[in-house]
From Swiss-Prot:
Residues that hold UDP-N-acetyl-alpha-D-galactosamine according to the record: 157, 161, 188, 217, 223, 239-240, 361-362
Transferase among keywords: yes
Name of encoding gene: kfoC
Protein name listed in UniProt: Chondroitin synthase
Enzyme class: transferase
Residue span of region Galactosaminyltransferase: 130-417
InterPro entries listed in its UniProt record: Galactosyl_T_C, Glyco_trans_2-like, Glycosyltransf_2, Nucleotide-diphossugar_trans
Temperature-related activity annotation: Optimum temperature is 30 degrees Celsius for highest reaction speed, and 25 degrees Celsius to obtain highest molecular weight of product chondroitin.
Keywords: Glycosyltransferase, Manganese, Metal-binding, Multifunctional enzyme, Repeat, Transferase
Record's catalysed reaction(s): 3-O-(beta-D-GlcA-(1->3)-beta-D-GalNAc-(1->4)-beta-D-GlcA-(1->3)-beta-D-Gal-(1->3)-beta-D-Gal-(1->4)-beta-D-Xyl)-L-seryl-[protein] + UDP-N-acetyl-alpha-D-galactosamine = 3-O-(beta-D-GalNAc-(1->4)-beta-D-GlcA-(1->3)-beta-D-GalNAc-(1->4)-beta-D-GlcA-(1->3)-beta-D-Gal-(1->3)-beta-D-Gal-(1->4)-beta-D-Xyl)-L-seryl-[protein] + UDP + H(+); 3-O-{beta-D-GlcA-(1->3)-[beta-D-GalNAc-(1->4)-beta-D-GlcA-(1->3)](n)-beta-D-GalNAc-(1->4)-beta-D-GlcA-(1->3)-beta-D-Gal-(1->3)-beta-D-Gal-(1->4)-beta-D-Xyl}-L-seryl-[protein] + UDP-N-acetyl-alpha-D-galactosamine = 3-O-{[beta-D-GalNAc-(1->4)-beta-D-GlcA-(1->3)](n+1)-beta-D-GalNAc-(1->4)-beta-D-GlcA-(1->3)-beta-D-Gal-(1->3)-beta-D-Gal-(1->4)-beta-D-Xyl}-L-seryl-[protein] + UDP + H(+); 3-O-(beta-D-GalNAc-(1->4)-beta-D-GlcA-(1->3)-beta-D-Gal-(1->3)-beta-D-Gal-(1->4)-beta-D-Xyl)-L-seryl-[protein] + UDP-alpha-D-glucuronate = 3-O-(beta-D-GlcA-(1->3)-beta-D-GalNAc-(1->4)-beta-D-GlcA-(1->3)-beta-D-Gal-(1->3)-beta-D-Gal-(1->4)-beta-D-Xyl)-L-seryl-[protein] + UDP + H(+); 3-O-{[beta-D-GalNAc-(1->4)-beta-D-GlcA-(1->3)](n)-beta-D-GalNAc-(1->4)-beta-D-GlcA-(1->3)-beta-D-Gal-(1->3)-beta-D-Gal-(1->4)-beta-D-Xyl}-L-seryl-[protein] + UDP-alpha-D-glucuronate = 3-O-{beta-D-GlcA-(1->3)-[beta-D-GalNAc-(1->4)-beta-D-GlcA-(1->3)](n)-beta-D-GalNAc-(1->4)-beta-D-GlcA-(1->3)-beta-D-Gal-(1->3)-beta-D-Gal-(1->4)-beta-D-Xyl}-L-seryl-[protein] + UDP + H(+)
Native source organism of the sequence: Escherichia coli
EC numbers: 2.4.1.175, 2.4.1.226
Cofactor note: Binds 2 Mn(2+) ions per subunit.
Binding-site residues, UDP-alpha-D-glucuronate: 441, 469, 517-520, 581, 603-604
Length: 686
């Protein structure tokens, strides 16, 4: 296994490319599962540098001004002061134009013909309103799936601390629960004989032992090792020094059994168990609840009140109804005492093994859960007691570790933490704050102008994601020619499947938390993203922000300003498509829906924004931020008969999702170009 040792040493010395090559050889010779995590670490480390390498190989003159400056700031390309200032001046000139205000007219927010007895269900009180989410699942026409409640797999990562681990295991022997559970001790290469401790409990617990070699602080890797060994559909992570109270398993499982879309967070208290052995806890089942609280040695994670350390999160739990009213709940997701459905590992990904120092990895993992649509809830009954190490002993320097991981966290968690940067200091980020998605089909004449308008925004923390939907013209070739090596542009090509499929593919390619929609023949005003982003930052509960547009011809000449309904209301959107370009929504809101409908060719956007309107509030900006090119081939003005049919279809499907059965949205006339409607009341036969 000398080849493996060589690979590990190369990785430690940051020679990632050679390390990757050797890890891949190990996979060929032995088993890919041995080095799967190592290969991923190398690929992650190489990702940004490879993008920069590609940029260096491409003529810098072809890259947009903002990207040049960001690469220069990151020392990826060399620019002298004169060159840099010239490019900054060019960028400011390109982005100087401000969006025009749209003409306003007085309107009623709720249409006058809206039925007086038709009430739309309330929206959530926050983006994390798990009570609202539970009620949404109960709606008659909402898709249901039978939960398989098989048990809880408890993963306990450990490095040494055999005595403390034994006490934690003893407390797991004392659980009062109707649910099955297993314990998986995941050893991060301890020097102490952890396996011997596990054997002590083989007759008392359903327990497993897994181990990896000591490669330094590898908490994420050892958590993943334990999670891969889990046999149940529900998993909990419990640090080895976190002794659970007797109702810990029951408190978690009785909630997970009701809703597997909620990740649960247990609070902690700080105690000293150094005067006890695990036998004391086996013989006195309530002992863990009786030991007095103390002041912790960990000055990073705790705060002191009344001569004892308290969990800093508890006050926030109380103020937000156990996080139900919190718009950033992932910030309180501490991996030492949590539980969730295992399905989320396959949706959001596993713990990020690039975190090799103390802190931050649980927030990053929690952010990915949140972005994917998971809810969070604190559970008082899942209290665990943090056992302080004797003599202030600690295997990791937490404060120093946090100084390192906070930088990685800022790179990988754009939402909430990330602030706007000035162009003079802006750099490329591992995970951008904003993604602009573009479904593209036969748009070779317009695609470069389209993409450049997205890159030349006053917000630079942004990427562009494109799905070429099997174009038969030069669209794909042009994308490859202009953007194959661009660090802020990603594109993919697929067989022609229609606008719904191309939109879904492009959105799934997006890494940002905020996602903007741009059609491939249109282009943005330079401040479009910033205007929307400002509204999102003012109100974290927003699911979507949209502006208005102007219609232009192929040459860019003004035809007319676009239709603009100046005030958003759910009732108006349920009656007519008022949510026009430019539109931005959160990735979380989109993940709470079924995505774009791939079975229809028209009214695809109307359907999508009705879905988004069902999961969160919208905000309208009365500014013209979007240029819509009318060339006769636009899907919204072709095949008017199908467009009309789908228009009424998607509204009625929205009503069905909302559990509204007493009204049907019906066309008033048979004319294809007519969108006049009537609310048809459906009499109940019962």
């Amino acid at each position: 296994m000398s080849i493996l040792n060589q690979a590990i040493n190369l990785y430690k010395n940051k020679n990632y490319r050679q390390a990757l090559s050797l890890f891949e050889k190990v996979a060929e010779i032995y088993d890919v599962s041995w080095v799967e995590a190592n290969i991923k670490l190398c690929q992650t480390a190489l990702n940004l540098s490879e993008e920069v390498d590609k940029l260096n190989r491409k003529a810098v003159i072809d890259i947009d001004a903002a990207t040049k400056i960001m690469c220069s700031n990151a020392k990826a390309i060399s620019l002298n002061e004169v060159e840099k200032n010239e490019i900054i001046s060019k960028y400011r000139e390109i982005t100087a134009k401000k969006s025009e205000r749209a003409e306003l007219k007085e309107v009623e927010p709720i249409p006058l013909d809206w039925p007086s007895d038709l009430t739309l269900p309330p929206l959530p009180e926050s983006t994390n309103d798990y009570v609202w989410a539970g009620k949404r699942k109960e709606l008659d026409d909402y898709p249901r799936k039978q939960l398989i409640i098989d048990g809880l797999s408890i993963v306990i990562p450990t490095y040494n601390r055999a005595k403390i681990l034994a006490i934690t295991l003893a407390c797991l022997c004392n659980q009062k629960t109707i649910y099955d559970y297993e314990v998986i001790v995941a050893d991060d290469g301890s020097k102490e004989n952890i396996e011997e401790i596990v054997r002590e409990f083989e007759s008392l617990l359903n327990i497993k032992y897994v181990r990896q070699k000591d490669y330094g602080y590898q908490l994420c890797a050892v958590r993943n090792l334990g999670l891969r060994a889990a046999k149940y559909n529900y998993v909990a992570i419990l640090d080895c020094d976190m002794a659970p109270n007797p109702l810990w398993v029951q408190s978690y499982m009785e909630l997970l059994a009701v809703d597997d879309n909620v990740a649960l967070i247990g609070p902690r208290k700080y105690i000293d168990t150094s005067k006890h052995t695990y036998l004391d806890f086996l013989s006195q089942k309530s002992l863990i609840n009786e030991i007095p609280e103390i002041i912790t040695n960990n000055q990073v994670a705790g705060k002191v009140e009344q001569n004892k350390s308290v969990d800093w999160r508890i006050e926030h739990f109380k103020n937000t109804d156990n996080l139900r009213l919190c718009n950033t709940p992932f910030r309180f997701f501490s991996g030492g005492n949590v539980a969730f459905a295992k399905k989320w590992l396959f949706r959001a990904g596993w713990f990020d093994e690039e975190f090799t120092h103390w802190g931050g990895e649980d927030n990053e993992f929690g952010y990915r859960l949140y972005r994917e649509g998971c809810y969070f809830r604190s559970v008082e009954g899942a209290m665990a007691y943090h056992q302080e190490p004797p003599g202030k002993e600690n295997e990791t320097d937490r404060a120093a570790g946090k100084n390192i991981t906070v930088q990685l966290l800022q790179q990988k968690v754009p939402y909430f933490y990330r602030k706007k940067e000035k162009i003079e200091s802006a750099t490329l980020k591992r995970v951008p704050l904003v993604s602009i998605y573009i479904p593209a089909y036969n748009c070779s004449k317009y695609i470069v102008r389209c993409v450049e308008s997205a890159l030349n925004q006053t917000i630079t923390d942004l990427e562009v994601c494109i799905c070429d939907d099997g174009s038969t013209d030069d669209t794909l070739r042009i994308l490859q020619e202009h953007y194959a090596n661009h660090p802020r542009v990603r594109f993919i090509s697929q067989k022609n499947k229609g606008i719904g499929s191309a939109s879904n593919t492009a959105v799934r390619l997006c890494r940002g938390f905020y996602i903007g929609q741009l059609d491939s023949d249109d282009f943005l005003e330079p401040d479009a993203v910033e205007l929307c982003l400002d509204e999102f930052r003012k109100d974290l509960s927003l699911a979507c922000v949209y502006t208005t547009n102007r219609n232009i011809d192929r040459e860019g000449n003004l035809i007319s300003n676009g239709y603009n309904w100046p005030i958003y209301s759910r009732e108006k959107l349920t009656s007519a498509m008022i949510c026009h370009h430019f539109r931005m929504f959160t990735a979380r809101a989109w993940n709470l829906t079924e995505g774009f409908n791939e079975s229809i060719s028209n009214a695809v956007d109307y359907d999508m924004y009705l879905k988004l309107s069902e999961v969160g509030p919208f905000k309208h900006i009365n500014k013209i931020c979007y240029n819509r090119v009318l060339h006769g081939e636009n899907t919204s003005i072709k095949k008017l008969d199908i467009q009309k049919e789908n228009h009424f279809k998607v509204v009625n499907e929205s009503l069905s999702r909302l559990g509204i059965k007493k009204y049907k949205y019906s066309p008033l006339t048979n004319l294809n170009e007519c969108r006049k409607y009537t609310w048809e009341k459906i009499e109940n036969d019962l």
